[in-house]
Amino acid sequence: MGTLYLVPTPVGNMEDMTLRAIRILKEADLVLCEDTRTSGILLKHFEIKNRLMSHHKFNEHASSAGIVNRLKAGETVALISDAGTPGISDPGFFLAREAAANGITVQTLPGATAFVPALVSSGLPCNRFCFEGFLPQKKGRKTLLESLADETHTMIFYESPYRVVKTLEQFAEVFGTERQVSCCREISKLHEESVRGTLEEVIAHFKETEPRGEFVIVVAGKEKVKSSDRKKQTDKKYNV
């Protein structure tokens, strides 16, 4: 049996690539990637001369069986995404599941992912959080947001610059305009920036300043009602 490695790649700065990731990509019998053109630039930068094969959301179900067979035959396969950690809003889950189901060793290297630095630098609680990634663009979007209306943990979303304002406005409708939010863009790149404030304030900012780059939006959870406050509300309700 071979080993399937899920290898994180930089989300911005090439210096975020780990030594172990470079070694695994050099030693692997096959490197799977979303886009051979994008990953080809990465491999060339680190002088990794290895074969690339496309493995993306449109072909992962069809190609996984053949990859599993190669792993069963003893090959070492490395999976990378265009940026970040495979499986986090990127292809990776299906192949990892199929490999594990067939008794193949699956190892994920620690490394770059966009939401962790955005969360930690947001100034919002990061001891407990829920990662939502990209919201559905149409079907189920409103239902999903409404299901998060009473979520008390910090929430994390990915968004493109073209939909940031619309998404923030939808957040304001569901969570209220005073909910705290941090919008982090261009993580680990030259123009990295975090805009923090209430939803109302951040919406106003991006209506005046055109959003650019990929965004991680970190939203505060709903404040828990203290037991003493809950008792007061109950007493008031029943005129105690």
Would you name each region that the model predicts?
Residues T154, Y158-V240:
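A contiguous loop/helix-start segment that scaffolds small-molecule binding in enzyme catalytic cores
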Residues T3-L4, G74-A78, T154:
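Loop/turn-to-beta-strand initiation segments
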Residues M1-K57:
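Glycine-rich, flexible N-terminal cofactor/catalytic loop recognition
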Residues F94-E151:
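Class I SAM-dependent methyltransferase SAM-binding "motif I" and its flanking Rossmann-like core
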